[in-house]
Amino acid sequence: MKHVSNVNEGPYEYGEVCLKEGDIVFDCGANRGLFSAVASRYGCQVFAFEAIPDIIDNYLSKTANMNGNIRIANFAVWDKEETLNFSHMLDHIGASRCDHLRDEIVARKKRKHLAVPAITLDAFVGKNGIERVDFIKSDIEGAERNMLRGARKILKEFASKLSICTYHLPDDPQVFREIILDANPKYQIVEKFSKMYAHVP
């Protein structure tokens, strides 16, 4: 029944955590760009973060070409700037992840190893002169907590709306809540079936 609940939550939106025209959106774990396309149609400016070049070349670039306000960022989103070793699942477009986050099931699948540049969202904002971030969506296969740790300045200064998947690691909800509130105690957080939504009123 979990998949039904996911559908009921909508496309990474819930309550006050919703896309609005003119929003600057960070789509972390853009994959094929489905959420990026939705945000684009709302009139948002989208930065689509995707770590795997094959996914960008075969899928995400096509989505971006059909929507003029999507900019692709070929980075893994992390808590420091470094190079990460990734496993790209050859038979599953949505299961690629940093090697030290792999589980046994993923480890047994056909995969290609590659080195991927990682960046923090705070560093990306600084390097690109981005004046605000209105919405952050994150589905990055267990690295969500690292993303949040690398976005502390964004959470404090911009109070971005957050839509974050919580089903990758058992303690995700607790860890995310602690990181978010430590960065900005004004956040109001709602936990649903497989996602966490947060905003500052």
Regions found by a protein language model. Give the residues of each.
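Phosphate/nucleotide-binding beta-alpha loop and adjacent structural elements of enzyme active sites
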Residues: 1-201
